[in-house]
């Protein structure tokens, strides 16, 4: 009998072991859909991005009008741009839900998978930031100026570093050119890191809602979960289509309809909604270097999750106290997001400071303590 090509061919074998015959826990819930949804998001963003890059000009005098030209004169250019801009928002929604799932179900105990995931998040944030600068609107320009300027808080080398990043003494043509180069390159780096992320995941196999070993129960990924992921994809692409077709500018900033002007500062400089929680943490500390460190810590704190796990149970499924804290953390992040969008005045300053404090306290102190307390209660 001839060997099955799907299982013997060097390339098809890899696809087969990752997407078809992959042994999967039978009880994984819809929260496990987000990995594949992120893959779909990445492919969508790369395709729409490539089409946009064909019509974009990375020059300060032409960038804004080239984007306008794409929307007005290119066949379906408006749709491609709207899908790309709103696809980024959907990408971040999926990423945050994916990370939330990892925190809730103790997936961070697969350390290599978790750490590559955080590196992926950082790369994604960098990609989104440099991409936001490209349309060269007011908020693009001032967002780039404010965020790159933060590097000047680094002692001794800060100012040199900023000028090196800018390619001059302010955000100008060289900055735009290099940001376009980076925005083109980084998604392919993300695709490469995704393969590493999956390689580490498939070494251990997926976690499941009970957090117990499920080797004896596993079922093939296809057709069970390929079909389930297809439903997830439909449920994700529908809001994207609705957003891109009916309210394409709902998540954008009105300032970006004005071409960049270094002489006029917008009244409220703020990033896209998916960075607002980190922006609120940055603003909550009156000292520049302190703010930058807090901003970095707000994301890098995820690296500590495996070491802060004190419970004898992996997931929070049967740990009501930890569940309460987890949802407290979610609410906390929503408050930070809201505060980040508000002007720097009373009462938003104090709310932001309190929310920043409780964010770090919950992750570093309360969750580990609660895990240890639950061990005691359960007589472990």
From Swiss-Prot:
It is a multi-pass membrane protein. GO terms for cellular component: mitochondrial inner membrane; respiratory chain complex III. The chain crosses the membrane at residues 34-54, 78-99, 114-134, 179-199, 227-247, 289-309, 321-341, 348-368. Keywords: Electron transport, Heme, Iron, Membrane, Metal-binding, Mitochondrion, Mitochondrion inner membrane, Respiratory chain, Transmembrane, Transmembrane helix, Transport, Ubiquinone. InterPro entries: Cyt_b/b6_C (IPR005798), Cyt_b/b6_C_sf (IPR036150), Cyt_b/b6_N (IPR005797), Cytb/b6-like_sf (IPR027387), Cytochrome_b (IPR030689), Cytochrome_b_C_euk/bac (IPR048260), Cytochrome_b_N_euk/bac (IPR048259), Di-haem_cyt_TM (IPR016174). One of its GO terms (biological process) is mitochondrial electron transport, ubiquinol to cytochrome c. The keyword Nuclease does not apply. Heme b b562 binds at residues 84, 183. It is found in: Mitochondrion inner membrane. One of its GO terms (molecular function) is metal ion binding. Heme 1 (or BL or b562) is low-potential and absorbs at about 562 nm, and heme 2 (or BH or b566) is high-potential and absorbs at about 566 nm. This is Cytochrome b. The gene is MT-CYB.
């Amino acid at each position: 009998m001839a060997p099955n090509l799907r299982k013997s061919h060097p390339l098809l074998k890899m696809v087969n072991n990752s997407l078809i015959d992959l042994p999967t826990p039978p009880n994984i819930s819809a929260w496990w859909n987000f990995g594949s949804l992120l893959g779909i998001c990445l492919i969508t963003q790369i395709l729409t991005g490539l089409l946009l890059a064909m019509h974009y000009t990375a020059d300060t005098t032409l960038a804004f009008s080239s984007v306008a030209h794409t929307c007005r004169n290119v066949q379906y250019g408006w749709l491609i741009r709207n899908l790309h801009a709103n696809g980024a928002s959907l990408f971040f929604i999926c990423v945050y839900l994916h990370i939330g799932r990892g925190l809730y179900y103790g997936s961070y105990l697969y350390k290599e998978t978790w750490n590559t995931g955080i590196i992926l998040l950082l790369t994604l944030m960098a990609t989104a930031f440099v991409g936001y600068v490209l349309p060269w609107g007011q908020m693009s320009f001032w967002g780039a100026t404010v965020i790159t300027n933060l590097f000047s808080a680094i002692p001794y080398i800060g100012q040199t570093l900023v000028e090196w990043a800018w390619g001059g003494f302010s955000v100008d043509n060289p900055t735009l050119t290099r940001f376009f180069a980076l925005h083109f390159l980084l998604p392919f780096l993300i695709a490469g890191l995704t393969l590493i992320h999956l390689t580490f995941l498939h070494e251990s196999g997926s976690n499941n809602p009970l957090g117990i070993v499920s080797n004896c129960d596993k079922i093939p990924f296809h057709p069970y979960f390929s079909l389930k992921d297809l439903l997830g994809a439909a449920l994700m692409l529908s809001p994207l289509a609705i957003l891109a077709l009916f309210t394409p500018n709902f998540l954008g900033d009105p300032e970006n309809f004005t071409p960049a002007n270094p002489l006029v500062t917008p009244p409220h400089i703020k990033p896209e909604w998916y960075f607002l929680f980190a922006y609120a943490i940055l603003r909550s500390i009156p000292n520049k270097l302190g703010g930058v460190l807090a901003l970095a810590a707000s994301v890098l704190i995820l690296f500590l999750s495996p070491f802060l796990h004190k419970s004898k149970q992996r997931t929070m499924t049967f740990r009501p106290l930890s569940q309460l804290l987890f949802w407290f953390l979610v609410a906390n992040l929503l408050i930070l997001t809201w505060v980040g969008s508000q002007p720097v005045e009373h009462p938003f300053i104090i709310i932001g400071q309190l929310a920043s404090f409780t964010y770090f306290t919950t992750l570093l102190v309360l969750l580990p303590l609660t895990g240890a307390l639950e061990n005691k209660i359960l007589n472990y």
